[in-house]
Amino acid sequence: MLSRKKTKNEVSKPAEVQGKYVKKETSPLLRNLMPSFIRHGPTIPRRTDICLPDSSPNAFSTSGDVVSRNQSFLRTPIQRTPHEIMRRESNRLSAPSYLARSLADVPREYGSSQSFVTEVSFAVENGDSGSRYYYSDNFFDGQRKRPLGDRAHEDYRYYEYNHDLFQRMPQNQGRHASGIGRVAATSLGNLTNHGSEDLPLPPGWSVDWTMRGRKYYIDHNTNTTHWSHPLEREGLPPGWERVESSEFGTYYVDHTNKKAQYRHPCAPSVPRYDQPPPVTYQPQQTERNQSLLVPANPYHTAEIPDWLQVYARAPVKYDHILKWELFQLADLDTYQGMLKLLFMKELEQIVKMYEAYRQALLTELENRKQRQQWYAQQHGKNF
């Protein structure tokens, strides 16, 4: 090969100085703030990397072919300060009961859903700090490789065992937090915390869980979510008390107003669209003898000014003469009531005039009929 001539810039460069590469340690505070998948890579291996455990007695012996661990998801031990170790130990002791705290708490026949779990993180919600727990390397090294043909039988045994395990678990342990890689064949609705399950949910409410296993309540009436049960003791207004009686059942007492009721004071009133029962109509006879006390109209006895009577009879073209802005609001209300009284009196006079005219017409018709009958009788006597 032909050698390339060095340029003037390359000739003028100084000789490189070889140094030692030192890896920078990450601060413990920043390590806790970084997500786990950034620090350690993916935590869920592929199916070809980890095989299911054997059901034989020698399944967990360390001799024989050992599973080759995937270095992409198994973290290496990190040198920590004594303060960091004490803080993690305190977090581990304060962890909830449904998280596995040691390798002895993990069932060996639980299947592959926990065989590759290297990190279990507690839910970090509402500002609570999360704790992480790691299983020892012997847990991975003690699993033997199995042929691919036997995995179908192991999968069936896994789901069958999970079904029996979920049925034997007590109901007060809460929802299991693992669920990584596979979903159990049993509904997780039976693994809820029954501390507030004794209270029935109001109409339009339902229960659900977050991705980290925390229980919350959904109000479909207002499309809102709540962490606490809608009918819990903490949800009562001030001055209310929930009483559980063997004789009367559960009821709520309002110590402020000295009353009791069965309905929760904060329960939403949802209208029900049930068919109402048929009601037979029974007309009630109104008693006409009762004297109804009606307040008298103050304008009937008030003296109407002369100018207001002139204004009521005057045509509209003279309205600009009165300056209404000089009147007070109370006076205008009084004059408006007086004008209504004048119009009612005028209407009453008009009605009386038409009624007198109608009575005169009826009287004239009656007189003419009587005259015709009298003439007919006289004409019959003559013949």
Swiss-Prot record:
GO terms for molecular function: identical protein binding; molecular adaptor activity; protein serine/threonine kinase activator activity; transcription regulator activator activity. Its main location: nucleus. Changing Y357A: Loss of interaction with STK3. One of its GO terms (cellular component) is nucleus. One of its GO terms (biological process) is negative regulation of cardiac muscle cell proliferation. InterPro entries: SARAH_dom, Sav, WW_dom, WW_dom_sf. It is found in: Nucleus; Cytoplasm. This is Protein salvador homolog 1. It comes from Homo sapiens. Changing A185D: In a colon cancer cell line. Keywords: Coiled coil, Cytoplasm, Nucleus, Phosphoprotein, Repeat. The modification Phosphothreonine is found at T210. Phosphorylated by STK3/MST2 and STK4/MST1. Phosphorylation is not required for SAV1 stability and may increase the number of protein binding sites on the scaffold molecule. The gene is SAV1. Homodimer. Stabilized through interaction with STK3/MST2 or STK4/MST1. Interacts (via SARAH domain) with isoform 1 of NEK2. Interacts with ESR1 only in the presence of STK3/MST2. Interacts with WTIP and AJUBA. The keyword Repeat applies. Residues 344-373 form a coiled coil. Residues 199-232, 234-267 form the WW domain. Ubiquitously expressed in adult tissues with highest expression in the pancreas, aorta and interventricular septum and lowest expression in skeletal muscle. Expression was higher in fetal than in the adult heart. Expressed in various cell lines. Regulator of STK3/MST2 and STK4/MST1 in the Hippo signaling pathway which plays a pivotal role in organ size control and tumor suppression by restricting proliferation and promoting apoptosis. The core of this pathway is composed of a kinase cascade wherein STK3/MST2 and STK4/MST1, in complex with its regulatory protein SAV1, phosphorylates and activates LATS1/2 in complex with its regulatory protein MOB1, which in turn phosphorylates and inactivates YAP1 oncoprotein and WWTR1/TAZ.
